[in-house]
Amino acid sequence: MDLSIRRMRKEDLDWLYRLLSDPEVMRWLEPLYSREQAETFLFCAGLSESPLIYAAEEQGVPIGYVIDHPYDEHSREIGWVLLPEYWGRGYASALTDLLIQRAGQERR
């Protein structure tokens, strides 16, 4: 696996909308998003000065997003939401490892 995590970009709206409007993906999360709601989510959670979400990529191709932000002074919230074609292939575990490494680097 060649995974990376990067800041979200405006150009991410198409795949983010596909993710957030997929009934299988959103089954246990929020109601399905409209394109306008996905755009608002991108700008508020991904493009803000202190983002809550980041794009997850495999060899430069977006596969979903990760959640990574301080929860309080002693803990952080981490998580992931992946496109269905990447489910069951070990990406969530690998992304969790990346997020833990990232958190450790920030503590130094």
What are these model-predicted stretches?
Residues 22-23:
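Short loop-to-helix capping motifs
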Residues 88-103:
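Conserved acetyl-CoA-binding loop-helix of GNAT-fold acetyltransferases
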Residues 3-18:
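A short beta-loop-alpha structural element at the N-terminal edge
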Residues 10-11, 27, 31-79, 83-85:
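Acetyl-CoA-dependent GNAT
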Residues 105-108:
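Conserved GNAT acetyl-CoA-binding A-motif
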